[in-house]
Amino acid sequence: MFRLKKYISPYLGYMVLTLLIKLLGTVTELMIPELMETILDDVVPSKSWNQIYLYGGAMLLCAVGCLVFNIWANRMSAISSGKITLALRHDLFAKLGRLSARQMDKLTIPSAESRLTSDTYNVNQLLARLQRIGIRAPILLVGGIFMMLRMDWLLALILIALLPIIALVVYFVTRKSLPLYTQQQTVLDKVVRTVQENITGIRVIKALSKTDYEKKRFHSVNDQLTHIDQKAGSITAITNPCATWTLNIGLTLVVVIGAFRVNSGGCQPGVIVAFLQYFTMILNAMLGITRIFVMFSKGEASARRVADVLELPEDLETQPGTEPEANSPYIEFRNVSFSYTGIGKNLENLSFTLEKGQTLGILGSIGSGKSTILALLLRLYDPDEGQILIDGQDIRTIPYEQLRSRFGTVFQNDFIMEGSIADNIRFFRDIPDQRLEKAAQDAQAEFIASKEGGMEADVQVRGNNLSGGQKQRLLIARALAADPDILILDDASSALDYRTDAQLRRALREHYRHTTTILVAQRVSSLRHADLILMLHDGTVIGAGNHETLMATCEEYAFLAQTQMGEAEEVC
């Protein structure tokens, strides 16, 4: 929790005030048994109604004060812990957005989700309970013992002798449960990942009749989580029964020994009644302290996981800039090599240049490095070797916002949000309606006009009420809407028929002459008009040139082109 002190510090004064109010409520609560003892042992024998009303009124005032102060403090603790958690979630979300793709690969999306939700919730609960019980329980414990020592030191020693037993139980439980709660959050990441995969791929799972298999896979991780939760719960479950049993033993001894002392004149009956009340307060205080330790185990484990992400060094910092190289190509890959894992190259010694307004086509088998080129150009990763330049400037020296504002991008299985068609194309950018219409027209998204409401027609989560081709055209319209300098289409026309694909390419050639376009596709027909085509295999370029050059010099390209041309006639 110490690692999150920057989030707690701004509210430290507010939290101290909360604790002071809680202290007032606790002190007024401690006064009630002593007032009762005075009434029973001094006021009642005197038969003075005025004193009975006076001390009775004082007890009532203390009870009301205790209620008001505790409610006030509890509300304040909820406000401060809520604001701290709000800032924590905000910074954690922003930090996740700044992490490189490589760091996110290591962290995993399910782990990021559970840290942003479950872990921050646990931190919130810990902060709130520390303010509510953290001052009240110790003050009740210490104050109760002090008041008991004032009344009868011999009876008080019985309780004091039992406290080390409870302290040992709390120490044992905390030591054993903290690693288990850390492990529990890690396994929770697996559960979230499994659920996420199943929900995302539910149609494929049903189509392949793999529902039973996925049930077994979920039951496996769910059983693992349940086992750890039960193990942690069985350890923490020791605390309350042990504390209650120990204190009840003490309570029994106090009643028995107290009865002998009353009979012998060693103390008054009111003292025994007050002792029983203080004993109940101390019992509740000890149980509260044990709950704090249990909550601390869970909250501390979560705080560590959150801090681990917040303290991650950002490995894609903008580097000091240099003067752009004169007379440089618009885009240049210069001897670029890259590996996702450090074992084997995903791209090896890749070099090519592209002038502004030209089109690059990338073709290759699965895993050949097509999408890796795009990820490097967008600087989702940095290359292990070599340079990537735009307008003669190394992209590592260009600020993120400035770099990525140049791009219009459509990835495979890209994000479609719930909302209107216009919202999805605009995507939180300041783009006029006329530009949205133009982008939709160029993307061949004529289906929009047939929808009820047109641009304001509803789109379901992940575009579930759209066909595959409609989704792709909607995403292409989004990429075109901002009139980007560089347009990236990663297999963005795979669901389009040949005619629509050809019309799309014609619109790009006619209306986006100054836009540099990079196409990744499986169809030769989608790339044949490109100024440069790269044929990749296992991260290496095995052919480079225009369509005619590759037909003459690259056997793999020629074979693929002839096979596809036999299936469909090119529509220009």
Functional labels for PLM-detected ranges:
Residues 1-32, 36, 44-60, 73-77, ...:
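Membrane-integrated ABC transporters
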